[in-house]
Curated annotation (Swiss-Prot):
This is Ras-like protein 1. Residues 187-189 form a propeptide. A motif (Effector region) lies at residues 32-40. It is found in: Cell membrane. It catalyses: GTP + H2O = GDP + phosphate + H(+). It comes from Drosophila willistoni. Belongs to the small GTPase superfamily. Ras family.
Length: 189
């Protein structure tokens, strides 16, 4: 069974823990208790393949930023979560993305942009803004509500598909690099 190491990142209070707990335990946690770091595991079937999701729910608070490099090194894919009612959390996404790329030393890392709290009546980040940023980054955008469970499975499953796509692409490039060059001519004497 394939295991996927997923990391949920974003500013404090955007609903990272609520999304993760909704996926793992099918219930909504409405009290806010800042996370330092929690790890969850769940077996799921995605596109006919049984796999194990190893999900790291991270601290959004700035005082825990020193821990980020470590979990970014071990993660295979990242959910970049912002709250649609917080323009600041949306602006912070770029910082998380750049830090992930720096730590992973890669231009392309599997990521999904997630706009959470879509059940709220007023949004400070419009759908079009988020779609435009996701398009610039070349990553999918999923709207979620941890409260109503809207888009929760979709966000995590889309990230697994992005990791698979990334592995396939790297595998193809690796095979091309390993092919010996057989363009030599022989002459019979």
């Amino acid at each position: 069974m394939t295991e996927y190491k997923l990391v949920v990142v974003g500013a404090g209070g955007v609903g990272k823990s609520a999304l993760t707990i909704q996926l793992i335990q099918n219930h909504f946690v409405d009290e806010y208790d800042p996370t330092i770091e929690d790890s969850y595991r769940k077996q799921v079937v995605i596109d006919g393949e049984t796999c194990l999701l190893d999900i790291l729910d991270t601290a959004g608070q700035e005082e825990y930023s020193a821990m980020r490099d470590q979990y970014m090194r071990t993660g295979e894919g990242f959910l970049l979560v912002f709250a649609v009612n917080s323009a600041k959390s949306f602006e912070d996404i770029g910082t998380y993305r750049e830090q992930i790329k720096r730590v992973k030393d890669a231009e392309e890392v599997p990521m999904v942009l997630v706009g959470n709290k879509c059940d709220l009546p007023s949004w400070n980040v419009q759908n079009e803004q988020a779609r435009e940023v996701a398009k610039q980054y070349g990553i999918p955008y999923i709207e979620t509500s941890a409260k109503t469970r809207m888009g929760v499975d979709d966000a995590f499953y889309t990230l697994v598909r992005e990791i698979r796509k990334d592995k396939d692409n790297k595998g193809r490039k690796g095979r091309k690099l390993n092919k010996p060059n057989r363009r030599f001519k022989c002459k019979m004497l």
